[in-house]
Amino acid sequence: MGHRLIHGASESCALPHGHNEFVTVRLDPTSLARLDGRGNMPVSFQKAKQTWHRFVDERLDHALQLAGDDPLLAWFKTHEPARAARIVVTPGDPTTELMVCLLMAKINAFLLAEGGVLRCSELSIEETPTNTVSFSGNPEEMIPAGRSPEACWWNRADMSISD
């Protein structure tokens, strides 16, 4: 994915640029139960990853990440509205630290909508071979506040990447 950081973190990151990011997700059952002696898993791997993989492949792959107040976002909405739909809009700069929290909230929304048998307990993004950010905990405690949770794309079990 590509992004740019406009709020002073690094001048070299202020221009749009990309990374070959690898996202790793750890899923845990929401409650412990003895395996059934047949399938021996709470949910099949195919079912557990189906919605998430579709989201990554169809919405995140080749997407651009921009802050909600980035002037480039307004430009796309005015001049290239079809391409604006491919922009991941974040509350503030789309740093890797923020993205791990947003994506953890998103996968947990998917998992809850699919029965809540599993939850994401850790999410890591490898931005470069020497830079990986991992998060475990409650992403809502880290994501910038200011909007109702229902109004945020990362809390909805749909394919949205902006509001």
Q: Where on the chain are the PLM-derived regions?
A:
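Charge-rich, low-complexity N-terminal segments
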Residues: 1-163
